UniProtKB/Swiss-Prot annotation:
Keyword Transmembrane recorded: yes
Membrane-topology annotation of the record: Multi-pass membrane protein
Localisation per UniProt entry: Cell membrane
GO CC, one annotated term: plasma membrane
Lineage, broadest ranks: Bacteria, Pseudomonadati, Chlamydiota, Chlamydiia, Chlamydiales
Family the entry assigns: Belongs to the chlamydial CPn_0129/CT_036/TC_0306 family.
Natural source organism: Chlamydia muridarum (strain MoPn / Nigg)
Protein name: Uncharacterized protein TC_0306
Length: 398
């Protein structure tokens, strides 16, 4: 019933070890390595000239060997870091899920259906003035920083060897965000085996585009229903790196809204943050901004809509509305739109969304971008968290 995790193949293990070695490479060690390699190259060159040239050319041969050593040293300083960066980017592009877990997700389901994007979400960000749209994509970091200000962070206590648990709460949402540095597969393996959490957890993550299952969800989200009652959503990864900023943001925004809306009946949603092949600073910022805009969008729903998993029938928010909400800290007052957010405390079972695989060292990632806003975070007692079930699981894993 549950996935059996086998050791990773030798090929994947070697790439993982190389990636860790590249990350741990220190500057002093790198200089010593470059100098040693350069001297070896120069020594070999000098020996070749010594045995192949007349004695009159020995002096010039030694000078040439020294010159080769210097050139080799600076060549190592330039080429090796480039190769390391290429290696790290290559290994990071590997799917985080093992083959056994992917096979489990493909076979242990009772039904598979493709969920097309909600037509109402396709009309988002229409009808707004060009100046708001221009500001949105020229300064996404300003909008994201302002969005962080609406969330109250709490840091759970942990032992010296354990990772800290950061929980964010929003005054307009009945659920919290739990930030975890543990990867999706680790959390999935432990949660799916927990008797307390089984049948109460939703899962959302990405699969590599080469996986045959993903072909069924090219235009939307693929949903799998299990006998245990859990749901998994496969988000198609864009295969083209030439994505326009607006299309990238809209696609991620629609996916986030749809995922969260479909999991309102779950106690916990384990979510692997959605990524795209574009690795620029602005693209990474838009990835995080899409999540927080989707959460703000869900704030503007009525009590009954949460209970029926249907979004508010009023016109969707546009760039101007998000500017008003995030920057001005005001409620949008457009025609036929509700004037204040609703917090349906009893209309949904969802208590927390666990964001997995966050890296503190990744300055362009969500956790890295949030670091300036966490220094005032309150050290909270675990019982104060809204998600006590997931807290117990995180403690067991750590």
């Amino acid at each position: 019933m549950y996935p059996v995790e086998y050791p990773p193949p030798l090929y994947s293990s070697c790439k993982h070890i190389l990636s860790l070695t590249a990350k741990q490479l220190k500057t002093k060690a790198f200089v010593v390595f470059s100098a040693s390699l350069s001297l070896i190259i120069g020594l070999i060159t000098g020996c070749c000239l010594l045995f192949a040239s007349p004695p009159a050319f020995i002096t010039s041969g030694i000078c040439l060997a020294l010159l080769v050593s210097v050139i080799s040293f600076f060549g190592c300083r330039k080429l090796i870091p480039y190769g390391i960066q290429r290696l790290i980017s290559y290994t990071k592009s590997l799917p985080a899920l093992s083959d056994s877990l992917i096979d489990f997700l493909k076979t242990e389901s009772t039904s598979i259906s493709s969920l097309l994007p909600d037509p109402k979400l396709k009309n988002c960000f229409k009808g707004t003035s060009s100046e708001y749209k221009k500001f949105f994509f020229d300064h996404p970091e300003t909008l994201l920083s302002s969005a962080f200000m609406d969330w109250t962070p709490q840091i759970g206590p942990s032992a010296p060897q354990q990772t800290k648990t950061i929980v964010l709460s929003h005054y307009c949402l009945p659920f919290s965000l739990t930030l975890s540095t543990l990867d999706f597969e680790t959390l999935h393996t432990y949660i799916v085996k927990s008797n307390k959490l089984r049948c109460h957890v939703g899962y959302a993550h990405q699969l590599p585009p080469a996986n045959p299952v993903i072909r069924q969800a090219r235009q939307g989200v693929l949903q799998q229903l299990y006998n245990t009652g859990t749901e998994t959503f496969f988000i198609p990864i864009q295969e083209s790196a030439l994505l326009q900023q607006e299309e990238l943001f809209k696609t991620l925004f629609r996916h986030y809204v749809q995922i969260i809306e479909r999991n309102l009946s779950s106690r916990v949603l384990l979510l692997e943050p959605l990524k795209t092949p574009v690795h620029t600073h602005k693209a990474r910022t838009l990835e995080s901004l899409a999540l927080f805009c989707a959460l703000e969008y869900l704030c503007y729903t009525t009590l009954g809509d949460w209970g029926t998993k249907e979004l508010d029938p009023t016109p969707p928010l546009d760039y101007k509305d998000f500017f008003t909400i995030l920057i001005k800290k005001q409620c949008p007052a457009s025609n036929m739109r509700i004037s204040s957010p609703a917090r349906p405390m009893n209309a949904t079972k969802l208590t927390t969304i666990v964001l997995s695989g966050l890296e503190e060292e990744d300055k362009l990632g969500l956790l890295g971008q949030m670091q300036p806003f966490l220094f005032t975070a309150e050290i909270a007692h675990p019982q104060r968290f809204e998600a006590t079930l997931i807290q117990n699981v995180l403690d067991d894993i750590a």
